[in-house]
Structures are given as structure tokens and as C-alpha cells.
Amino acid sequence: MLKSRKFWAYEPCQAFELKEELFDNYKMKGKFNEDVQYFYDIIGIAPHPCFKLKQYKLDPQKEPVELQSIEIINSKIDINTLKIIFYMLPSTKIYNMKFISNDWDINNLEYLINSLLERPNNIYYLSYEWNDKLSINGTNVSINSEEGKTDYADYFNKEKNLIYKLIKNSKLEGLCLRGDLLGDEAAIRIFELLEKNNTIKTLSLYNNNLTPKCFPAFCHMLLFNRKLEDINLGKNFFDDECIANLKDNLGKTAMSQEDVVEYNKKVKERDAIIKANAKLKQQKKPENEVPFLYEMMMIQDQNYLVKNKDLKIINLMLNPLTDKCYDSIINIFDNCPDMFITIDNKVLSEEHKNSFFDKKSKYFDKIYFSK
């Protein structure tokens, strides 16, 4: 036990070892603040500020508002605070965790991700924002610095692998990676993993140094992902050509009669595989892979191949777009009537902007112009 300290501090709390048997042998009192205080008393230090963010009273006559979110902003997180958080989580209604500008120790970050995946919790929304620096040997190193790209590259590669692991295995519905400067290669891997992800509905990759290099992977992901509804790609380097390519991977595409014949042929082939797999399953033999087919639907005697109709919101603000993207945006709205897009106020000409302000237009209120 440390000499009692009035205020929480990272170094002494990080250096102390809260052993697992302390948690195993403790019988919770059912009062959040008292249970948290017990472990910090053992350390001999005040609780981390994150435990007080939402513990306020709206009315002196009423009970404190129950904690539903853990938010750690502009503060480091020691290993013992993480242990206490995950010990307390199953007995709370906390569903949201926000970690913003924390200068993580990579081992602490690994503990966080592994605990999210392996320990009981009800976390469905995670923000890991503006964390472009890691604390390495007592020094904060940026992912974009020369040292971050050379001497300490392994640390940042481990950080990225932890993010991939989270996307691949967790039950998260919302993930915010804003301002982490992850880069194209990381984004490509994230999009690849999202092809098979069936939980994440909202994703922010705002300000991640993304260029047109990773955009084909984003478009390809849209062909397979059927869960993502809202993506923030703001403050990157996507251009007009990216938007032109995007329209081919959203909504519906008209089919010719030949297309319909070919599609029906593939449906029969797929159904035959499914039928054969049922027998293989009974025989406990390996099943064959079932080919993926898009949905076909008919609208007013015209058949359409339906691609991604689930994505509803795209934020493209602070990207180097020009008025040339107008036709592509219109095509996206034609293919996806429920789509909503955000771009900068200065991207489109006044004439083109006005087309979205006409209440009689089908494009009215489909776009937000950020200032």
C-alpha cells in the first residue's frame, strides 16, 4: 500500500500491483462508489477521475444518476484502473466506453482489448479517439513521427493488430477511431474484416490519413457487409473519383433479360449446394462453401440487382472534393433513396447546392453542408 494520496496520479498507480485474488475474495457491497473506493484504498490513492464523470445529482433529493458511460479524456489510464473497471462492469449498466487522447502504454491497451473480448461486460460502443501517440519508455511517440515509423514501428503495428482483433471478434455496435492517423494499410485491413462483421452499425475513421489507395477496399466491403449503417470518412484525402466509384457499390442496378437468366442459373447452383450441404452436415462431413448472391428485386416490371442498401449515412466533410462530384452524388441518391451525405459547404456550386434546397425536389434534405 502506498502512502495515502489525495489525488490520483498515473505513475504510482501504474507501479502498484493489485493481485487477482483481491478481486476474487472481495464481496461487493452493491454501492458503486464504495466498491471502487475499496480497491483504491488498498493502493493508497484517490480513484481515477473517470469514476466521477457521471456521478452527479440532478436533484439533491434523488439518488445519483447511474453510471452508463466510462469516459477518460486527456488522461492516461493505469493498469489497476482498468482492472477495477472490468471488475465492476458486470454489476453496472455501462454500455459505452470513451478513451480520448490517452497516450497509452501498449501493454495497458492490450489488457483493455483482451478484457473487452474475454471478460463479462455489456460494452456495445467504444471510442478510441485522437490516440495517435503511445507512451514508450516514458516518452510519448507519434505514429507519424520518424521514430514511430522506424524504431518503434512494432509498437504501432501491435496497436493496429489489437484494433483488428477487436473488429474481428467483438459484439460492438459502434466503433469510433477518430483522429488515430492509422493510414491506408490499416484501413484496408479494417475494411476486409468488416466484410464478415455482422455487429458494427456505426464506424468513424475521421482524420486517419486515408487516401484513394484504400477506397477500393471500402467499396468492396460494401458489397458484402450488411450491417454498417453510418460511416464517417471526414477529414481524409478522398477525391471526386472515389465518389464516382462509390455509386457503383450502393443501392440497385438495372438488369437486362440476359442478366436475369444468368442470375437464376446461379440461384439454382447455389440451392443445389445448400441441399448437398444438408446431407453432408448429417454425415458430419465438411460442407462446401455457399456462393454469395445479391438480392434481385422487381420494381415496375424492371428487375434490379440490389447491392448495399443498408448504409444510410456517409460523412465526407473536409475531403478534397470539387463540384465535379455532383453527378456522382445525384446517382447515389437515385440508387439509394434513404442515403444522407455530409460534405463541405464550399464543394458545390451555388446552382448545384440550390438543387438540394428545393422542397419539391426528391433530393431535398438529402445532404448536409458543413461549414
What spans do the regions from the language model cover?
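Leucine-rich tandem repeat or coiled-coil scaffolds
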Residues: M1-K371
